[in-house]
Amino acid sequence: EILIGLVGSEMCIRDRSNTPLQVNVTCMNVSSHVSKHTSASHINKFYTTFEAVRNMYFDGLIITGAPVETMEFEEVSYWEELASIMEWSKTNVTSTFHICWGALAGLYYHYGIQKTPTGKKLSGVYSHRLLDRCEPIVRSFDDVFYAPHSRYFGVKRDDVLANEHLMLLAESDEAGCYLIKDCLLYTSP
C-alpha cells in the first residue's frame, strides 16, 4: 500500500495507475493546516489524517510539494506535523519518495541540508544526465533525459556529495541536483 501525503495526490495517483501491479493508495492531508484552495468536504471525503494511519505500515510514502518554498521550514504552519510524519516514516514505511518542496523538506529534516535560492525562478524543461545507471530507480532512464522544474530554491551539489548517506543519481547543468538517494535507508538489491 502506498501513502501519499500533502498535495498533488491526484497527479501521483494518475502516474502510478498505469501499471500491471495492484496498488492500494491512501491519501493523507496534514490536519494542522486548513487548505485555502481545496474544500473541506473534498479533503474529508478523499483524505485521511496522520493520526488515523499512525499505527499502520506502508510500502511507500510520497511526500509532495506545497507553495511554501520561500518560507523557512519552521515557519510553515504544519512543519511540526510533517516532521513527525517524516520521523514516523523511518519505522513504518519501506520507501519514501520526496518530490518538489517535499524533497527540500526531506533533505533539511533528515540531513540538515539547507535550501538555497536560485536567484530567479527556475521554470522550464531541462536536460539531465544520469550519474549511475545501475540504480534500480533509473534503469529505464536514458543517459540524458528531460524533466520540468518550477521553483525558486534548490540544494547545493557539494552539500549532497558531502553527506556519506546520500548518492546523487541525476543532475542538470542548468537545474542542479535532480534525483538523490539515501544509501543508508534504501540499498539496492
What kind of region is each of these model predictions?
Residues 21-34:
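A short beta-strand-loop structural module common to alpha/beta enzyme folds
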Residues 109-188:
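Pocket-forming structural segment of enzyme catalytic cores
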Residues 14-22:
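A short, Lys/Arg-enriched amphipathic alpha-helix followed by its capping loop at the start of a domain
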Residues 58, 63-134:
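Cysteine-nucleophile active-site neighborhood
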Residues 7, 56, 91, 143, ...:
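Structured loop/turn residues at beta-strand edges in well-structured enzyme cores
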Residues 39-54:
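Glycine-rich, highly charged phosphate/nucleotide-binding loops
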Residues 1-8, 13, 186-189:
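Single conserved hydrophobic/aromatic residue that forms the stacking wall/gate
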Residues 26-29, 97-100, 118, 149, ...:
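A structural signal for short, well-ordered beta-strand segments and their strand-loop junctions
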